[in-house]
């Protein structure tokens, strides 16, 4: 994987996924063994949208590999504010770093930016498009808790604008998971994702009510309704708060159901779920460090 750009989950085969997840498991078991792996490496962080988990976990991952980061900081304090194009920005920052991580509000921005640089570039979210490293840590969490064999997963919430959903749904086709999509009709999967799933031979099973499928699920992947993606605030208000789960909801679930969420959550998972054995969303976030360490190590020439 050396020097490859990671733009979309669609470019990852089952073998690629297993390689990253196996390497992440090795790192999680003995992180100190990788502490000086990339001591001369600088990772450039270009975040044009807010981020907590993704940005901090990439920072932690690079530093735990012995490297360091160069952070563009906020858009307000950069030359982007003066009108600099994304192409010019990545070309400049490429000269300071050995790899780049980009988050941008425009769908397709990571693919475009990758055409202007020679160092590895990782898409950390391009609008409502893709979020492949979130998908890798999601798959790691699923494999650790439920495994991939005979997996039945429900993906609930904002399926239209949720880039984590778009990435994960395609990646799950590589492990032959049975996928169920739960959302209001106005937030169902976009046509492009439906086409990709159809091309991958995956069935699309849609529900408007979680109760219809909850007892069958091994994993429930919950997402927030993304207010910032709606073109009209009134459209957001129509669907906000429609899908919420609490301890009572989960009474009908399997005892070993795994509940996941890419975070941040708003009100879609009640806090009483946090104390149940179902809740894995905080561990899911923590898994971002070994998974991103593994990906960076492999992209930058690790031995695995």
UniProtKB/Swiss-Prot annotation:
Highest taxon of source: Archaea
Enzyme class: transferase
Keyword Transferase: yes
Signal peptide (residue range): none
Annotated residues for binding of L-aspartate: 82, 163, 224
PROSITE patterns xrefs: CARBAMOYLTRANSFERASE
Catalytic activity: carbamoyl phosphate + L-aspartate = N-carbamoyl-L-aspartate + phosphate + H(+)
Pathway as given in its UniProt record: Pyrimidine metabolism; UMP biosynthesis via de novo pathway; (S)-dihydroorotate from bicarbonate: step 2/3
Residues that, per the record, bind carbamoyl phosphate: 53-54, 103, 131, 134, 263-264
Stored SUPFAM superfamilies: Aspartate/ornithine carbamoyltransferase (SSF53671)
Keywords from the UniProt entry: Pyrimidine biosynthesis, Transferase
InterPro entries linked to this entry: Asp/Orn_carbamoyltranf_P-bd, Asp/Orn_carbamoylTrfase, Asp/Orn_carbamoylTrfase_sf, Asp_carbamoyltransf, Asp_carbamoyltransf_Asp/Orn-bd
Record EC number: 2.1.3.2
GO molecular function: amino acid binding; aspartate carbamoyltransferase activity
Listed GO biological process terms: 'de novo' pyrimidine nucleobase biosynthetic process; 'de novo' UMP biosynthetic process; amino acid metabolic process
Function of the molecule: Catalyzes the condensation of carbamoyl phosphate and aspartate to form carbamoyl aspartate and inorganic phosphate, the committed step in the de novo pyrimidine nucleotide biosynthesis pathway.
HAMAP family in the record: Asp_carb_tr
Self-association state and partner proteins as the record states: Heterooligomer of catalytic and regulatory chains.
UniProt similarity note: Belongs to the aspartate/ornithine carbamoyltransferase superfamily. ATCase family.
Protein name: Aspartate carbamoyltransferase catalytic subunit
Lineage summary: Archaea, Methanobacteriati, Methanobacteriota, Stenosarchaea group, Halobacteria
UniProt gene name: pyrB
